[in-house]
């Protein structure tokens, strides 16, 4: 059995934008160490549910994530 080689982690900056319908109202930035940009995006979106901007009283709450190298 050979040891598994894990992918090196890279640091990504992920901007999560919060919308009410099509109107943007806030952005939070996360620095995420991850193996891929997709993994960083998913982690940031998951973390954003704990944001003060994630509020059930906001109509048609949506969010998007933009990933860039740190």
Feature names for model-found ranges:
Residues 1-3, 68:
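Charged, amphipathic alpha-helical segments
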Residues 4-28:
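Short aromatic-glycine-(Arg/Gly/Cys) micro-motifs in beta-strand/loop hairpins
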Residues 12-14, 44, 65:
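Amphipathic alpha-helical segments in structured regions that serve as interaction surfaces
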Residues 14-16, 32, 67:
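Hydrophobic aliphatic residue packing
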Residues 17-21, 35-37, 70:
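Generic structural motif
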Residues 24-38:
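A short, exposed loop/beta-hairpin motif centered on an aromatic-Gly-Thr core
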Residues 35-56:
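A short, charged, amphipathic alpha-helix used as a generic interaction element across diverse proteins
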Residues 50-70:
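Short, mixed-charge low-complexity intrinsically disordered segments
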């Amino acid at each position: 059995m050979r040891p598994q080689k894990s992918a090196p982690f890279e640091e990504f900056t992920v901007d999560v934008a919060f919308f009410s319908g099509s109107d943007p109202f806030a952005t939070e930035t996360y620095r995420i160490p991850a193996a891929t940009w997709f993994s960083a995006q998913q982690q940031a979106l998951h973390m954003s549910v704990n944001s003060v901007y994630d509020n059930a009283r906001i109509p048609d709450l949506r969010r998007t994530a933009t990933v860039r190298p740190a």
